[in-house]
Design a protein with these regions (language model features):
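Generic recognition of well-ordered alpha-helical segments
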Residues: 134-137, 157, 201, 208
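C-terminal cap of metal-dependent C-N hydrolases
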Residues: 99-105, 110-111, 123, 130, ...
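Active-site neighborhoods of metal-dependent hydrolases
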Residues: 1-143
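Flexible loop/turn segments at secondary-structure boundaries
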Residues: 82-86, 114-118, 158-161, 187-189, ...
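Acidic, glycine-enriched loop/beta-strand segments at the rims
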Residues: 87-97, 142-151, 159-196
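A short, hydrophobic/aromatic-rich structural module that often spans a beta strand
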Residues: 161, 227-229
Length: 229
């Protein structure tokens, strides 16, 4: 059966009940409902297909249920039937993040895809705020990392691991990939309501020695190049 036939079966309360039972009792690692603590409050709707009520955007599945006048499980099935939504599952808590940061071998990265605000309709806020958040929250606010260690985990440590020996350090002979920021002002401001907002407190960014952010303004230059080991 195809997608349309499957979606049609979701109108059957018996099918919904069976799917719910399987999800609640299956311990497989691909079960994201378990990853979020089996709580629809931990699943945030970030965008929706054309046939979906736009009021559910930026709400959890539980919050969407309140808007739609139903319970969370039926809201989930109703949203799938209406065309689907994109979600952000909150599968890690702060304690788990602190445990990871306590390990000296842990690097800091993000899997967000690079996007151009002038040509892209949407993005994940981590594309614009992941690294500034490390400094504003885990260095300045929580004190979980020193500034030097945070920078190391986001630059030289990753460069060494990837075998990029001429990058990641500020030293004679190194490629000038540099970022100048105010450690007291840098912070992420992007969120799911407005994901493509540049972080604050970053004044200059140099790629291969060329300023791509110049006094806080994006420059119309393309000095980057493909790196091959």
């Amino acid at each position: 059966e195809g997608t349309s036939e499957f979606l049609a079966t979701l109108a059957d309360p018996a099918v919904r009940a069976e799917l719910r039972r399987e999800v609640e009792t299956t311990g497989d690692w691909e079960n994201w409902y378990r990853h979020v603590g089996m709580d629809w409050e931990n699943v945030l709707i970030v965008s929706a297909a054309g046939g979906v009520d736009e009021r559910v955007i930026n709400r959890s599945i539980s919050g969407a249920a309140e808007v739609l006048g139903t319970d969370a499980w039926d809201a989930f099935f109703d949203l799938v039937q209406a065309g689907g939504v994109s979600v952000n599952p909150r599968s890690m808590n702060e304690e788990q993040k602190w445990q990871a940061l306590a390990a000296e071998y842990v690097m800091i990265d993000t899997d967000a895809s690079p996007v151009n605000p002038a040509t892209s309709a949407s993005a994940h806020p981590r594309a614009f705020g992941a690294f500034p958040r490390v400094i504003s929250k885990y260095v300045r606010q929580d004190g979980a990392l020193s500034l030097e260690d945070a920078v190391r985990r986001m630059s030289s440590m990753a460069a060494q691991r990837l075998g990029l020996h001429d990058r990641g350090f500020v030293a004679p002979g190194q490629i000038a990939d540099l970022l100048l920021f105010d450690p007291d002002a840098i912070r992420d401001v992007a969120d799911f309501g407005d994901a493509m907002r540049y972080a604050e407190g970053i004044d200059y960014v140099f790629v291969n020695g060329v300023a791509v952010i110049d006094d806080g303004v994006l420059a119309d230059v393309r000095p980057g190049r493909l790196l091959r080991r």
